[in-house]
Amino acid sequence: MDVFAPTGNLYAGAIWPEVVVTLTLLLVLVVDLVGGSAARKSLPALSIFGLIGALVTLVLQWQQPQLESFLGSFAADPVSILFRGLVVGTAVLTVMMAERYIAQSGAPTGEFYVLLLTATLGGMFLSGATDLILVFVSLETLGIASYLMAGYTKRDPRSSEAALKYLLIGASSTAIFLYGMSLLYGLSGGQTKLEAIASSMGDAGLAGIIALVLCIGGIGFKLAAVPFHQWTPDVYEGSPTPVVAFLSVGSKAAGFALAVRFLATVFPAMTEEWRAVLSVLAILTMVLGNVVAIAQTRLKRLLAYSSIGQAGFVMIGLVVGTEAGYASLIFYLLVYLVMNLGAFLCITLFSLKTGTDEINEYSGLYQKDPFLTLCLSICLLSLGGLPPLAGFFGKLYLFWAGWQAGAYTLVLVGLVTSVISIYYYVRVVKTIVVKEPQEMSVSVQNYPETNWQAEGMPALRVGMVLTLVATIFAGILSNPLFTLSIQAVEQSPFLGFPTAQAPIPESASLQVAVDGSLGSLTQPSQG
C-alpha cells in the first residue's frame, strides 16, 4: 500500500510528516494532562521519537514523485523536503538540550514540548506553503509559539523582557508583511496562489515595488537581516538557551525557505530589483553582525551577532539565484544546523553547571572538562570557517557560487568578514584552553564534576557527540551533501532549472590559485 497515494484531489500524502508531528503533539498534550509525574518524564522521549518519525517520512517522501497537495496550497518538492528536514532536525536537538534545562529550572515540562512541536509544525508548513493564506497562518503559528517559548521561564525578568521585545517587533514585522500580501492580492485580482499572483500581476509598476519592499521587510525579520535584526541580541541573551538554539536555526531555516519560494515564484519579473535590495542587505548584515560581535562579553550575545553575520553569508546564495547559489544556501544551512546547535549544547551544559555565559568565566575550562572544551572549540572554529571543518566548505561553496555569478563585491565582503569572525571565535577558544592555573576563572575553579546519569544528561551528551561528529565529518563528506542539494534544486519546478546535472565542485580536489584579488576554482569532471 502506498502511503503517499492521492486522497481525492488533495494528495494528503504530501503532509504525512506534518501529520506525524501533529499526532506527537497531541500525544504529548494528553500525557501531560492526564499522566502522573512518571509519565511526564517520558515526554522528551515521546517528542524525539515523533520527530524522528517525521524525518523518516520525509526520507520516504524524497523517493516519491513530485507532490502538490491541497489544490496547490502546499508543495512537497525536494527543496521543501530539505527545509522541513532542517526544521525537524533542529527540534530534535533542541529537545535533547531542553530536557536537563527544564528539569533544573523547575519550569512546567509538557507546555514547553507542546510549544516546540507547534513551532516545528509552523516552520514545516511555512517551508512548503504556496498560498498566501497558508503562508500567513504558518508564519503566525511559528511566530506565536516562538514568542511564548522566549518567555517560558517567566520568573526570570530577562526572559519576560525578551518575550515582550520579540512580540512587539514580531507583530510589527507581521503587519508589514501582511500589508505587502494584501497589495499582491489586490494587484493580482484576488489570487492567493503564488504562481497565479505572478501570472496575474503583469506590470504592477510602483505598487508592485512597494509590495516587494514590504514583503522583504517581513521576511528580513525572520532572517535577522540588517536592519530588521534589532530583536536578535536581546532575545538571544534573555531567552532560555534551548529556545535560542531553535530560533537560531529552525526559525531561520523556515525564513529562508519562505524567501526562496516567495521571491522566486511571486516576483520573477522583478528579479533584478529584489536581488539588488538583498545584495545591500547582505553586505550590511555581514559587516554589522561580525564587527559588533567582536565587542561582546557574553557568549550567547556573541552568537546572536554571529547568527546575524551567518545570515548575511547565506543570503549570498539567495542573491545569486543560480543552481549553485540555491544549492550552496541549502548546504550551508545543513552544516550550520550541526555546528551552531553543537555550540548551544555546550553553552547549555556550562550554564547549567556555573549559572553564567560570560566569556571570561570559560577561562581554563580545558583543565576541568576536556570533552566540553573539544566540542565547543570544534563548533566555534567551524562557524569561523576553518578547514577542514564543515563551516569551511559551506562558505567555500557560497563564495564559489557568488564568484561564478559575478557577485564579486558580495564575495569580497564575505571573505573579509569571515576573517573578522575567525578572530572572535578563536578568542573564545583561546580563553577556554589556557593552561596557567592562575588564569582559571572562579566559575571553572568551582566547576562540579559532570553527572551524566542525572535526568536529561544522557540526551545532552548524545546531542553533543552527534553534533561534534557531524561537524567534523560533514566537511569530509561535503561533496555528497552538496550533490544532494543540487539535486533538490534541479528537481523543484518552481525554481525553473533544467533537471540536467549541473557542474559540482569536488571538495576533495578543489584547487585554489591566487590570481589577482581572488583565486579561481577548478572543477574536475564527475567520473
Swiss-Prot record:
It is a multi-pass membrane protein. Its main location: membrane. One of its GO terms (molecular function) is NADH dehydrogenase (ubiquinone) activity. The keyword Signal does not apply. It is found in: Cellular thylakoid membrane. It catalyses: a plastoquinone + NADH + (n+1) H(+)(in) = a plastoquinol + NAD(+) + n H(+)(out); a plastoquinone + NADPH + (n+1) H(+)(in) = a plastoquinol + NADP(+) + n H(+)(out). The chain crosses the membrane at residues 11-31, 42-62, 78-98, 106-126, 132-152, 167-187, 206-226, 240-260, 276-296, 302-322, 330-350, 374-394, 396-416, 462-482. GO terms for biological process: ATP synthesis coupled electron transport; photosynthesis, light reaction. InterPro entries: NADH-Q_OxRdtase_suN/2 (IPR010096), ND/Mrp_TM (IPR001750). Its EC number is 7.1.1.-. Pfam families: Proton_antipo_M. GO terms for cellular component: plasma membrane-derived thylakoid membrane. It is an enzyme of class 7 (translocase). Keywords: Membrane, NAD, NADP, Plastoquinone, Quinone, Thylakoid, Translocase, Transmembrane, Transmembrane helix, Transport. NDH-1 can be composed of about 15 different subunits; different subcomplexes with different compositions have been identified which probably have different functions. Belongs to the complex I subunit 2 family. NDH-1 shuttles electrons from an unknown electron donor, via FMN and iron-sulfur (Fe-S) centers, to quinones in the respiratory and/or the photosynthetic chain. The immediate electron acceptor for the enzyme in this species is believed to be plastoquinone. Couples the redox reaction to proton translocation, and thus conserves the redox energy in a proton gradient. Cyanobacterial NDH-1 also plays a role in inorganic carbon-concentration. This is NAD(P)H-quinone oxidoreductase subunit 2. It comes from Synechococcus sp. (strain JA-2-3B'a(2-13)). The lineage of its organism: Bacteria, Bacillati, Cyanobacteriota, Cyanophyceae, Synechococcales. The gene is ndhB.
